[in-house]
Amino acid sequence: MQIESKTNTNIRSGLTLIAPFFLWGTAMVAMKGVLADTTPFFVATVRLIPAGILVLLWAMGQKRPQPQNWQGWGWIILFALVDGTLFQGFLAQGLERTGAGLGSVIIDSQPIAVALLSSWLFKEVIGGIGWLGLLLGVGGISLIGLPDEWFYQLWHLQGLSINWSGSALGSSGELWMLLASLSMAVGTVLIPFVSRRVDPVVATGWHMIIGGLPLLAIALVQDSEPWQNIDLWGWGNLAYATVFGSAIAYGIFFYLASKGNLTSLSSLTFLTPIFALSFSNLILEEQLSSLQWLGVAFTLVSIYLINQREQLKIQLRDIWSLVRKPVIND
């Protein structure tokens, strides 16, 4: 009986650990499902503002402190514009033009940019494993985002015929997703500065609300009634992306982070695009080319190498010390 109870506890802990990544991945699919009936900026607005209200209500219930000075509010506003307005705005624009699974892979490549920014701003050491991950990441994103024809022309030693008009790179969903990923990376770098002055959960709630307001204004300028064509299924998709994909996912993530599971969480980042790819294929029947699948594989390996570079370095050092250990004959 005790063994069974321990097994159930381990299963619940494991499910809780992967829950945020499952919710974030499937939320991308839910957002994609409603974009045909409304504008990208309205979807981004609904993803942010109601979720921010829910997070703040929970924070109030936990008696977490509100911002106390204008310096704290200043950091929240900056965080909101970068990680709220720009990130969700670019994401929704990109999602309208590309698949949910592919978009999620590009979005979750942001540890690549975070590593470079941290190296530049905080003098963090990337190391050999990190640089290998960065190279794989750049290659993976190139395979995902650039036209397949470019690579086939290079393979056959032909000159590149680049078309920047129409549906080419300049207006591609992959480019918007890359901008979203860069915005998220800058937002990630801002988090330590925000957390020093404001409770992180409270900052998350306010940044969702403040970041959503410019998106709401743009959505209403584009269409005075952007909700009029959304059916019951579409509202269900939006509710899922808002409640589960934002409020609950962030709540679980912060709960796990407060318990000291940051290493486990960072090592599971690659699960978000895997869930998004799986459900976009299952529900939306999205298909990728062979080169794009290769790019997905490169990018996922890159995310793992960058997030786990310190742990991998220790493991490789231990293996090397065992290999070099002299054999003592009796």
Swiss-Prot record:
**InterPro entries the record matches:** AA-Vitamin_Transporters, EamA_dom
Q: List the disulfide bonds.
A: none
Transmembrane regions: 15-35, 41-61, 72-92, 102-122, 125-145, 175-195, 201-221, 238-258, 264-284, 286-306
Its record classes its membrane topology as: Multi-pass membrane protein
The yes or no answer to whether the keyword DNA-binding is present is no
The record's Gene Ontology cellular component field reads:
plasma membrane
Q: Where is the signal peptide?
A: none
Q: Where would I find the EamA domain in this sequence?
A: 22-146, 182-308
Name assigned to this protein: Uncharacterized transporter sll0355
Identify the species of origin: Synechocystis sp. (strain ATCC 27184 / PCC 6803 / Kazusa)
Taxonomy, top ranks, is:
Bacteria, Bacillati, Cyanobacteriota, Cyanophyceae, Synechococcales
